[in-house]
Amino acid sequence: NHAWYGIVSNLKTQLTENLNLNLGLDLRTYKGDHYRQISNMLGLNGWYETRRLFNQDHANNIPGTTVVANNTVTQYMPAEPWKTFFNSIDDNQKIDYDYSETISYGGVFGQLEYQKNNVTAFFQGAVSNQSHQRFDYYDYESKYSDSEKVNNIGFNVKGGGSYTFSEKHT
């Protein structure tokens, strides 16, 4: 299951006869749930699995400290394309992986443009941040299931201009 929400907005205004301002905003957020489930038991009554859970150091093989999880799966959802959008299975009936992810993005930009006679010039800048975090319900001990939230900040600044020598050349 995935859910995207967001807004993109733009404002363009003429400040003077020769000066235009363009401002924008882009906000988005995403929440996704990712897991695997059985679609056909192929005649079996159930599926049993044992797995070693990861700790805060992402290790699952330390003697004496490794936590083991056991899981018995008895439910399945037939692989019918349109039903997969709406089906829901109990957490203890998931196999292989089960995690959620949240991604958020925010950005603003602005551009100032000057134009008079044969001269045009502009200055543009933008800043954005994308953050993401994973919540692993399957492979980690519950107290370590939330990953660190990571932020990726970006920006740009540009400027430029042109002079028109004639109608055919700039």
Model regions and ranges:
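Short alpha-helical segments and helix-capping/turn motifs at coil-helix boundaries
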Residues: W4-N10
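Signature of Gram-negative outer-membrane beta-barrel scaffolds
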Residues: L21-T170
